[in-house]
Amino acid sequence: MTLTAFVDDLARSLGFLSRLPIASRFFQNHSGEMSRTPRAFPLAGAVITAPAGLLLALMLGLGASSMVAAFAAIGLQVLLTGALHEDGFADTADGLGGANRERALDIMKDSRVGTFGVLALVFGVGLRVAALASLVNSLSPINVALVMIGIAAVSRALMVWHWHALPPAKPDGVAASLGKPEDNTLYTALFLGLAVAVVTIAPVTSFHPLAVMLVASGAAAFASNRLVSHRLGGQTGDTIGATQQICEITALASIAMAL
């Protein structure tokens, strides 16, 4: 793995996961195939979330309430990602409400958001905001920002696991057209997710909250893998995004409870 190749993958990951402007040269002569690129997802997640963490710290420093600052931070995250993961979360929630596999996949292709999708977004955003506001009571503003960055890396690593662990549910779907992460891609993503979490979270909390967060988010990803495999027979672009959201929500809630 050369540094230049990894920087290219990081830039492509940022372009794939966010609305950040990325130079077109990183996509020239690239087929769009994603067997290697997701290894940089954890670092991309950290970069994407850093502005939201800094906004949270700034607003708290200027006297904003924890709830207002948390809402603003989550709102900026959504803007920076173009609600990519939230869209997948809502579509997956709607789809899993379907009576069978075929109906579920049809529902997930529908651009309209149903009742389950709306409820998933309400509860998902609400839990993230509440957990962030709770963290403010235990940590300094800048330390909460660091926790956000670490969790962003972990949740992106676990979405790579979901992508790698399951076959495509639809042979003509977006996930199938992009290819599947290689074994080394998964191992690198998991290592980077863990490394970023250790560097950002361990120094500002302790080993116990970090361990609780890692175990809880890993268990959430495992449960997501099993549920999606059972109901849909494989992953889609929507379930990959949903797994990221499930893991982020679980990570924020678990570390807030552990502190």
Curated annotation (Swiss-Prot):
InterPro entries: CobS
EC number(s) on file: 2.7.8.26
Gene Ontology cellular-component annotations: plasma membrane
Topology versus the membrane: Multi-pass membrane protein
Transmembrane stretches, start-end: 43-63, 64-84, 116-136, 141-161, 185-205
Cofactor dependency: Mg(2+)
Record's catalysed reaction(s): alpha-ribazole + adenosylcob(III)inamide-GDP = adenosylcob(III)alamin + GMP + H(+); alpha-ribazole 5'-phosphate + adenosylcob(III)inamide-GDP = adenosylcob(III)alamin 5'-phosphate + GMP + H(+)
Listed pathway(s): Cofactor biosynthesis; adenosylcobalamin biosynthesis; adenosylcobalamin from cob(II)yrinate a,c-diamide: step 7/7
Keywords on record: Cell inner membrane, Cell membrane, Cobalamin biosynthesis, Magnesium, Membrane, Transferase, Transmembrane, Transmembrane helix
Any GO MF annotation of the entry: cobalamin 5'-phosphate synthase activity
Major localisation: membrane
Biological process, per Gene Ontology: cobalamin biosynthetic process
Compartments where located: Cell inner membrane
UniProt keyword Transferase, yes or no: yes
Keyword Transferase in annotation: yes
Enzyme class: transferase
Coiled-coil boundaries: none
The family this protein is said to belong to: Belongs to the CobS family.
Biological role: Joins adenosylcobinamide-GDP and alpha-ribazole to generate adenosylcobalamin (Ado-cobalamin). Also synthesizes adenosylcobalamin 5'-phosphate from adenosylcobinamide-GDP and alpha-ribazole 5'-phosphate.
HAMAP family named in the record: CobS
Protein name per Swiss-Prot or TrEMBL: Adenosylcobinamide-GDP ribazoletransferase
The organism of origin for this protein: Allorhizobium ampelinum (strain ATCC BAA-846 / DSM 112012 / S4)
